Amino acid sequence: MKLTGLLFAAALLGACTQPAAEENYTRHVDPKIGTGGHGHVFVGANVPFGLVQVGPTSIPQTWDWCSGYHASDSTVIGFSHTHLSGTGIGDLFDITVMPVVGEVTYARGEENDPASGLWSYADRTREITKPGYYSVPLVRYGITAELTATERVGLHRYTFPASDAAAVVFDLENGGCWDKATDTGFRFSDDSTRIAGWRCST
């Protein structure tokens, strides 16, 4: 009887102890695997089965950049809300947003000549990629971009330097690779606090 009582007491004490700390499995994830070579992997913020994959889109429009990102490149033409990953064919890049400082241009620009368009080099040494979050400094503008996502929404936060010439450009025309806009438009709400828009493409 004493042995049964001791075992019962030990079981009760064991049940009263703190549960083991939850393991953070996302710390083992490297979202940049497959972004070099011919991997065509998207880098940015998304959630499983989400409708948006918000992340950077680079200026090159060739096969290895069909996800919008390649490890060998540090250009950013904007942050698009839809990307394909690992497909080997380019599409989407819908609703691209680019924070800028200074004179606004709507030209895409030429590779190796940032002054020809609105794009910037990204500081890849300070880039942060983890599940559900992406951040990178834009060298040309001194802006830090941060992105995260829900199932249906891409969320952006931009930290600008002190300036009277800060702006955010919404690019409805430029897609990626073989994607071409066929119908685009936007409108402001009556109180100018919201923007609604659309982009249809091939």
Language-model segments: what does each one mean?
Residues 1-9:
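Sec-dependent signal peptide recognition
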